[in-house]
Amino acid sequence: MFKVKVEIVTGFLSSGKTTFINSLINKTLIKNEKIVILLCEQGNRSIDSRIKNKENIKVKYIMLYKEITEELLFDIYKYEKPDRVIIEFNGTKDLKDLSNVMSNRLIKKIYRVNTIYHLTDCSTFNVFLSNMGSILISPIKYSNIVMLNNKDRVDDKEINLIKSKLLKINPTCYILEVNSTSCIEKVVKESSLFYIDIFYKLKLALEKYRRRDYDR
């Protein structure tokens, strides 16, 4: 059975999450792929209008006082029929809550968490880790890729210290260094970590064919 691919993007406000999502879609969007983007906070930047205006991409805003629930995900699956869901997660909320939702037996039958990304601002990392460690550690621990944004704001010694702390929390994560938010698109475009999975592309094509045949 084809499962909806889920990518979760975590990080505090102004860490570069929305810019990253724009860059990720620009690099990995497959022809006829239907994507739903769930935005759980309102940042300084917005989803690129060229992305929002695509017929096969739907942007949904989740109010701050609301949560991503099993019911919401079932509704999205039923009414939007996405191939991929990208969640921009609220950095002040515990990722474990979302993890519990995604671990629901029925949700796991239709959704599959593929990649978790975490973006952090090098200039505020230590402050947040000291004061909000319980919230910050969870997304780092479960992330596949951690992006260190605003590297230009700190010296090399500080960068190495941050990387050391990250690897203590998550020894297997990939760490990418970015000079500033304006450089995120270039890094995503050039990195081999962000690619179109050929097996996903094939499964997607087969699923589109199956749906078309079913609708006849």
Predicted regions and their residues:
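Phosphate/Mg2+-binding loops and adjacent switch elements
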Residues: F89-K165, N170
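Short, hinge-like loop/turn segments at secondary-structure boundaries
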Residues: N53-N56, I135-L136, S192-Y195
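Residue-level detector of flexible, active-site-proximal loop/helix-junction positions
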Residues: K66, S123, S182
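Alpha-helix boundary/capping detector
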Residues: L39, I47, T124, F128, ...
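Nucleotide-state-sensitive switch-loop elements of NTP-binding domains
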Residues: F2-T10, S15, T19-T115, N126
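Short, low-complexity, intrinsically disordered N-terminal peptides in bacterial proteins
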Residues: M1-F2, D215
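Structural signal for conserved beta-strand scaffold positions within catalytic alpha/beta enzyme cores
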Residues: Y61-M63, H118, L148, L176-N179
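C-terminal accessory "lid"/substrate-recognition subdomains
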Residues: D155-R216
